[in-house]
């Protein structure tokens, strides 16, 4: 029982670690352990106020690094959504609750990034993370329904 909770916590800590790493490049593993520096001028209001960078589109190009970053967002947050799902009790709305937990964590993670020099939090990444969670939960939902319908057809 505790194993599932530990795994979801480790996944959340892993995501937070990468979010706390400035100038992170997926294509350059030497950047995966950069020391972080807090932006002491940043405030929650300066991040979330209308017109802030949080709502802007990406200013960097569409290259291999960009594609790998977005694939990492989709896959890491997709797995996290599944872990949230497996940690919830068997209740109605379990898929939705797992997705809402995932979306909330994605939002908080992007806010966290906005406080780190060399990182930027974007609402677009919250949407990509949430899409990744929805996609993985959709695959799980279809897998479970196919499995259930096969059992029903055998009867």
Predicted feature residues:
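Bulky hydrophobic segments
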Residues: 1-114, 123, 130-147, 151-155
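Sequence-specific DNA-binding recognition helix
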Residues: 120
